[in-house]
């Protein structure tokens, strides 16, 4: 029998306890739990806390990624606006259209009264509340917002997507597009969004007179011509200035306006169909009284040279004068025009009653 001193026994006990704490006992691996799908109910998918917001997000993410720069900007504006309100709907509730949403939709449906095509705006059909589920609600709300911004774009000439390709080069203007972020923020905050939409159209009195003429002739051939003129006014700057000059090309007249009232008018010379007058808007910097007209190259080549080879009647009829390129006068009768090239000379019309530029330009 071996005797162990008490103090060694105590030390060994302490070591045993310490060792037990430091070394974990080996564990036995548990067998996997096998469930029988025949008797185990399936796990329900997580419930969407806000299905309407989810539908809004889904609709926004599914919008096309191509289009004009303005269209892409509009989509970005909508995404940011909805995100700021946690994708809550703007124009609809579970009970259907809000009063503001109904007013907005009703005004868009009247787009034809303003010369616009209501079919372009693709307003959604809103079902009765009993059939208005979250998916339909969220999708329709975004579609109404898209229609609003598209209406604003078309109200200011934006329905012609590629002016440089689709329009005559004589039209030297740009659509007066409004900032979509400003438009949407103001429309969403407006107590009367219908009135806000009406206010997006040009405010020039000429536009309103054309609109009334369009309404009176809708369905008649004349209506298309009126629509074309209304569209030109959508491209006109909103502010023409306290004083401005307006040339009415079909009327052969120019008007001087001050504070919205015509204070002077003059007859003007305009181009023929094949040589149309350019339609433009620019700040007026210079006025020339009793101007001299320098005949353009195309007129010299296609009209004057053939006439000089015949009898030079146009030179006599219009008091035209011939000059060298450095401005020295020449007698056109001393030149053999069967050999000479008129492009080597300048043709001018001095100031006077026959001058095609009139008394001022």
What are these regions (language model features)?
Residues 21-29:
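Boundary at the C-terminal end of the N-terminal hydrophobic targeting segment
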